[in-house]
């Protein structure tokens, strides 16, 4: 893995293969062992495994509280994918309280794992039929102190505007563009709206 410098497909493919061909207890040990590596690519592999195991509460908690502290941005990208894996496997509507909990977390990487992981939100079951539920959750972070999170919020809203331009337009029309934070999100979110 350490020779892979771009992308994550190889780590994802290997993690899925190992998950499918071993019992969960072995995979859990493998995931923690990989995550303890000094090599970010190996940690990425471990986080993919965590995503497959995330119906276990201790794994989901570890993702939220520990993986979110990893200082490598690539590992954070995989955390977003792992969170989406959890939501997909459990059911998006069923995990709304957990989505909300992560969106309110003190760690910006945890909040971003949701906003980025569930992109394109309205392509996901439940949110496809309930786009306002996605919009409501995302816009709650429009003034987030983290620029990293705000960019993800703006991009997520822009994605939604492709399918639901009127909903996003109506939402943006209610914003008071008085801070640089809101203006940053507005600029990203309104990019495709006439």
Predicted regions and their residues:
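Alpha-helical scaffold domains
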Residues: 1-194
